UniProtKB/Swiss-Prot annotation:
Belongs to the bacterial ribosomal protein bL27 family. Residues 1-22 are annotated as: Disordered. This is Large ribosomal subunit protein bL27. PROSITE patterns: RIBOSOMAL_L27.
Amino acid sequence: MAHKKGGGSTKNGRDSNPKYLGVKAAGGSTVSAGSIIVRQRGTVFKPGNNAGIGKDHTIFALIDGKVSFRNGRNNKKQIDILPV
């Protein structure tokens, strides 16, 4: 017979790395071209004028300017970059 108990297993002990999602540039703030405005999962925000969208749905500025949020279609916020 074993004189030590066998090591038990656990179903816990995992934690995923943080993804740092959310709005990175507030409305009215000045951004340069290529700046990330929103990191998101899915299209909570849609790109508007002078804003682009990456393959992971990140919204970024295409030109230097000011960030502007507005209500778009289907209850989605739309993000525009207004030239300064």
